[in-house]
Structure formats: C-alpha cells, structure tokens
Design a protein with these regions (language model features):
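Conserved ABC ATPase "signature" region
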Residues: 86, 137-154, 260-264
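A short, proline-enriched helix->beta-strand linker immediately N-terminal to the Walker B motif
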Residues: 178-182
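Helix-to-loop junction immediately C-terminal to a conserved catalytic motif
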Residues: 70
C-alpha cells in the first residue's frame, strides 16, 4: 500500500467535465444544445505506486473519466496534469511520450486483442510504436513479460482464440507493462471473467505493482473487487464524485447515503453477521444524464433527502482527514464486516 503523505502526485485531475452531444449526425451536433453530462466537475489525485479505485453503477461516468485522462477523448472542461505537466497543453509528440508512461487495460479480453495478430505481436506492439529496442530485444522482452504474467513464453506465436478469457486478460496485462509505465488505467479488467479467475488476475496485478512500482487507476462496479486492491477509493454517481477516502475508512464508516446503500448490499459469508446488518434500499432508477436533477443529483433516490437537497449542490468537503464527501447531511454509518476475501 502506498503512502500518500507529503508526496507529489503522479496524476492530478482538476474539475474535469465531459459532455457528449445527445443526437448524432452532422447537423444535430452543430445545432442541437442537448448534451449528456457523463462527467461533471470531478477532482482527485493519484500518487506513485498507489491504487486509486473508482467505483459506481453502470453509466456513472467512471470509464469516461479514464478515457478522458488518457486523452482518448477530449474533456469539455477541467485540467489533467501528468507528472506536473498539463496534458491539454502537450504537443502531439509530448502526448505520445505521455502514453508511453500511461497505459490502458481494457474490460473485454476478447475484443481488445487483434485476432489476426500473434500474442508476441500484440505484446510487442507498444514497443514497436515507440521504437523501443531491436526486434530481437523486443522478442526477449515479450518472453519475459509472458513469464511474469504466468503464461508460457513458448506460446509467443499463438493467436488469441487459442487462449481462455483469463489468459487473454493476462496478455492484455503483459501488453500494458511492455513499456514499463508509471500509471496504468484498469477499466473493469476482471468484470468479464469468472469469479474464480478474478482473484487470480487481481493478485497478479498486485504482484506486478509490488515488483514495478506502477500506480493504478482501478475502475470497477464491484465493491469487493475494488476493496481487494485499492489504497484509496472514490465513489461516483451520475457523473459526480460523491465520496473519497482510504479504503478502510470508506468501507467501515461511509458518510454519503449512496456509498452506504452500496456497501449495505455487499453480502457477508457469515449468516449471523448478515442477519444483523441493515439493508438500505434505494427507490427508483438513476435519473437520465440528459436531464440530471437540480441540486444534489442523488436527491431523487436518497432516503434522507430534504428540501435543500433539490435546491443547492452540496459542497465536496472534507469530513475527516483525507475523507471528503458531497452531502448536506453527511454522517458516518458503521458497516458490519463488509470486507470480502476473493
């Protein structure tokens, strides 16, 4: 686990927002004013060697956050600083250099690998693009990486269809580590895998982090997965960041009603403890990002909402050292034994 005290952040995100046009087509994009607010004014930092978990329901904007940081899509507003440099002010050459230090692990191990390329070609592709080493050196590096992620280096000339889902994701992990990056954005890297395989991949990511000192932005919707690997965790709802803290505090004493409801739904493998836990049921479905609620975006489903919640946006403020929450009535809610070993 990384110590974030008195350290310079590797990645700093300030008031990041991303909107998409609601309609497609040339004229709609030019004349329509309707937009989907995917990410709205979020800020956080990631320090060298730490894992920062980003969790939320589907459609909350967590994957868009990762893609915007990587500059795969341009932000509507806000700034992203990587190693102290403003990404928006980087030239194309500097962007390419940044991507050498910042890599991506995709969610789908089937769609993220080119079926026409061998495993060796897939893993060596980042090195080829960035002109790293000779062909022989790249092949040797690929063999080393395959061995590190638990695959047989002799399978270097095989194709993706010859591997299982878990093995394919290991290939994706090997590719992400090929350039020895300082930060890897993991976009739900285990959600498409069987539960039995998820733990293996998570443990592999932790081992590689210990070995290479790489930082992770770990995006997921499964709270137990995020808890298993993260140093700090942020919770998103409908494009907004509602709570952020170290994982122990967040999972034991969440302050935001949305975080509390998510954690109350995490099952505990002890029937005696499970019987005593209070389940928080949310009413209705998340509102459309096309027309988000006024004030606090969570107030339409919040069990403790009052008049001010629909009128005024809550400040994202510190409720304890290192623990921030966006709620007018933030209070700790003790969670009994929410930890789950994968």
């Amino acid at each position: 686990m990384a110590d974030t005290n008195e350290r310079t952040p590797l990645l700093k995100v300030e008031h990041l927002s991303k909107e998409f046009p609601a309609e497609s087509g040339m004229f709609a994009k030019r004349f329509s004013k309707r937009v989907v607010s995917a990410v709205n004014d979020i800020s956080f930092e990631i320090y060298p060697g730490e894992t920062f978990g980003l969790v939320g329901e589907s459609g909350c904007g967590k994957s868009t956050t990762g893609r915007t940081i990587m500059r795969l899509t341009k932000p509507t507003a806000g700034k992203v600083f990587f190693q102290g440099k403003d990404v928006a002010e980087m030239s194309k050459h500097e962007i390419k250099d940044m991507r050498r230090e910042m890599q991506f692990i995709f969610q789908d191990p089937y769609a993220s690998l080119n079926p026409r390329m061998t495993i060796g070609e897939i893993v060596s592709e980042p090195m080829t693009i960035h002109g790293v080493g000779t062909k022989e050196e790249r092949i040797e590096r690929v063999r080393e990486l395959l061995d590190v992620v638990g695959l047989n280096p002799e399978h270097i000339n095989r194709y993706p269809h010859e591997f299982s889902g878990g093995q394919r994701q290991r290939v994706g992990i090997a590719r992400a580590f090929a350039l020895k990056p300082k930060l890897i954005i993991c976009d739900e890297p285990v959600s498409a895998l069987d539960v039995s395989i998820q733990a293996q991949v998570l443990n592999l990511l932790k081992e590689l982090q210990d070995k290479f000192g790489t930082a992770y932005l770990f995006i997921a919707h499964d709270l137990s997965v995020v808890q298993h690997i993260s140093d700090r965790v942020a919770v998103m709802y409908l494009g907004k960041m509602v709570e952020i803290s170290d994982w122990k505090t967040l999972y034991s004493e969440p302050h935001h009603p949305y975080t509390q409801s998510l954690l109350s739904a995490v099952p505990v493998p002890d029937p005696d403890i499970q019987k005593t836990r209070k389940r928080i049921i949310l009413a209705g479905d998340p509102p459309s990002p096309l027309d988000p609620p006024t004030g606090c975006r969570f107030h339409t489903r919040c069990p403790i909402a009052q008049g001010i919640c629909s009128e005024k946006l809550p400040e994202f403020k510190e409720v304890a050292p290192g623990h921030c929450c966006a709620c007018h009535f933030a209070e700790p809610f003790p969670i009994k034994e929410s930890h789950i070993d994968l």
